[in-house]
Amino acid sequence: MPKQIVIAEKHQVAAVFWKDQIQELVVSTGSQQVGDIYLGLVDNILPSIDAAFINIGDTEKNGFIHVSDLGPVRLRRTAGSISELLSPQQRVLVQVMKEPTGNKGPRLTGNISMPGRYMVLMPYGRGVNLSRRINREEERSRLRALAVLIKPPGMGLLVRTEAEDVPEDAIIEDLENLQKQWELVQQQAMTRSAPMLLDRDDDFIKRVLRDMYSSEVNRIVVDTPAGMKRIKQQLMNWDQGRLPEGVLIDCHRESLSILEYFRVNATIREALKPRVDLPSGGYIIIEPTEALTVIDVNSGSFTHSANSRETVLWTNYEAATEIARQLKLRNIGGVIIIDFIDMDSHKDQLQLLEHFNRCLETDKARPQIAQLTELGLVELTRKRQGQNLYELFGQPCPECGGLGHLVELPGEKGFVSLSPTAVNSSIPPRLVEKPILSPPVAKVNDLPKKEEAKISSPLDLLFHPNYQEQGDRDSNRRRRRRRGSEFSEKENIKSVGISRSKGPSPSPTKEKVTGTAPPRRERPSRRVEKTLVPVDVAMTTLEQDIYARMGISPLIKTEYADQDPRSFMVSVVTAGAALEGNTNGSGSLVNAVITTVDNGDNGDNVPSDGLTIVSEVTAPTPVIEQPREETVEPEQVVLPQLDDETPAAPVAEESAPIETKKRPGRRRRRSSAE
C-alpha cells in the first residue's frame, strides 16, 4: 500500500500517511531525545534500589540509570552492588533510552547503540541479530552471513528490516559510517569535560527518512526548497548515487501552511480527545493514567446487523483496527488494557484476537498481546518510544491541576480545584479575603470577664426578679447577665488598667478576623421602661423570712386588685419603722431584694431547688441583721414562739394556704444569707 511522508522542517514535525490517514507522527522536542549520547557525572547513588542519578547537564532533572543498564562498567568488574561499581563524581558514558516524562528525568543506559540506515552498531554488544520482520529464510541466511563477516571485533550488530534485498556494498558502507561516528564519540569522551552532549542526530530530515522511509513510500513533501535538496541527496547516498524509482519529492507552495493543508493539526486535536468515533456508529474511549492506559469499546448507535452477535463482532473488529492506529498515532506505551464488548462465543473471541494481532504487525514498537482475561479484558504491552502525544502537545489544566474536574464543597460557593498546584481563576466569592486597613477596635464589653462575672452584686428586695419580673424568665436571665457584665466591666478596667487613650486593644473572645465574615451585630434591646407604683408594706422580721422562704409576694397584704409585681415598687418596713424612720437618718425606707433562682440557670453559690431568698442591703441596722442571725439555723424558727406584737391570726391565715400549695417533689432551699 503506497505511503507518503509530509515534513514540516520549520516546526520539526513529520507525519506518515497511509490510506489518506495519518498513521504516525515524528516530533523533535529539542530536549533529551532517544539516542542522544552524553558524558555524565555520577551525582547520587542509591544502593537500596541498585540505581544512581547521573548529571547530564540538565539543571532541573538528572538521568536515572539502573545497575542492569551499566553495560561496560558492569562487565569490567565483578558483579556486585551499584556502590561497588560507581562512585560519586565518576565520569560515565551514557545514552538516553527513554525521554523525560512528567516529573521524571530521562532513563539512561550504558549499552550504547549507533543506529544506521541498514545496520545498528552496538559497541558493547555481542553477536549478530536480525530483524524479525525479515521473513524469507534465504534472505535471512544471506544477511546473517554478511553480518558475521563484517562485524567489528568486540562489538555487536543488528540487521534492520530495511537491509532486505539491499546490495552488500550499501550495507558495508553504512557500517563504515557508523564506525567513524563511534570513533568520534570516543575521542570527545577523552577530551571533553563532563557533563557534555557528545552525539545527537540534529538533522531532522535525515532522522525522519532513516526511521520512516521504506520502499512503500511513493511521495515526500517538505515545506522548504533546501529541505527538498537534502532529501534527494540523502536518498541518493543510500542508493549508490541514484534516486529511487517511483518516489515523488515535492516542495509545498500553497498559501496555507503545510500542517493545515494536510490536516496534521486537525488530526492532533482529535487525537488529544478521549473519544474516537467508529465508521459504523460505535466509539472508543481512551483514558491514559499514571500506571496504564485504559480503552473502552462501546457499540453506540450501530444497529444495522441482523442480530446482536453480528453487531458485537463487527463493532469489536472496527474498534481493534482503530485502536492499533491510535496506539501509533498517540505513541502510547507501557501497559494497555482494552475492554471490548462482551462476546459469549469463544470462537468470536479468537477471531477478534487474530484480527487485532494482524493490525499490530505494522507497529515498529512491537506490541505484545498478553492474554484475554476471564472478564473479557485484553492485556498488551507496547514499547515506549519517546514522549506520547499528551506530553508533547498538552499540559495540565491550570484550573483543575490535571484532575479533569472541579469540585463544589458544601457550604461554599463556586467550584475549586483539589490539586495544590492548580491556579484557580474563579475563586469562590466567600473565600476572597478583603484587605484589612486598620486593626479592629476593641470594645470595653469585649474584655475578658470570665472570672469577674462570677461576682454577684448585693441583693436588693425591690428589684428581685420574683417580685418585679415574675413569669419572664428568659429576659430575666439576659438582664441578670447584662448587670453582671456591667459590674465586671468596672472591675476589669481597674484590674487590667486599660486606658482608652492608649489605643484599641483587640479582644480574643468577641471578634475574630476571618476572610469575609461580617461583623457581628448587637441585638437591639427590647426592654420597655415602666413607671412603678411605690408601695409600703409593713412586715415583721419573721414575716419577711417566711415570705422569702415561701416565695410569696408582699403585695398579698395590700388591697390592690392588680397585684402584678412588675407594676409596683415594693418597700418592706418593720412594724413601727415607718414612724421612726431608718437608723441612718435618711428618712428612706429599708430596701430589700428577693432573688429567684431557676433550676436551669444556677450560679456557683446558689442552691438549685428554686426557693426564694431574701436579703437586705442597706446600711447595717438591727432590723437587717436580725434575719441573718435567725437564718443561720432555720430549724429554731417555730411559729408558736412569736412575739406579742406580731399578730398571730394573719400568720396562721397566710401559712394555711401555703401548706396546701406545696407539692410532693419540692425541696426547701437554704437562704443565700447563710
Curated annotation (Swiss-Prot):
It is found in: Cytoplasm; Cell inner membrane. Pfam families: RNase_E_G. One of its GO terms (biological process) is tRNA processing. Residues 35-117 form the S1 motif domain. Its cofactor is Mg(2+). Changing residue 98 to A: Considerable decrease in CRISPR3 crRNA precursor and psbA2 processing. Endoribonuclease that plays a central role in rRNA processing and mRNA decay, and probably tRNA processing. Acts on 9S rRNA (the precursor of 5S rRNA) and RNAI, a molecule that controls the replication of ColE1 plasmid. Upon expression in E.coli does not purify with endogenous degradosome proteins. Prefers 5'-monophosphorylated substrates over 5'-triphosphorylated substrates. Complements an rne temperature-sensitive mutation in E.coli, despite being considerably shorter and not able to interact with the E.coli degradosome. Cleaves AU-rich sequences in vitro, tested with psbA2 mRNA. The gene is rne. Binds 1 Mg(2+) ion per subunit. It comes from the Bacteria. The keyword Hydrolase applies. It comes from Synechocystis sp. (strain ATCC 27184 / PCC 6803 / Kazusa). Residues 484-493, 509-529 have a biased composition (Basic and acidic residues). It is a peripheral membrane protein. This is Ribonuclease E. Fractionates in a 250-300 kDa region, which is too small to be the equivalent of an RNA degradosome, as occurs with E.coli RNase E. Interacts with polynucleotide phosphorylase (PNPase, pnp), probably via the C4 Arg-rich motif (residues 665-673). The keyword Cytoplasm applies. PROSITE patterns: S1. Mg(2+) binds at residues 296, 339. It catalyses: Endonucleolytic cleavage of single-stranded RNA in A- and U-rich regions. Coiled coil: none annotated.
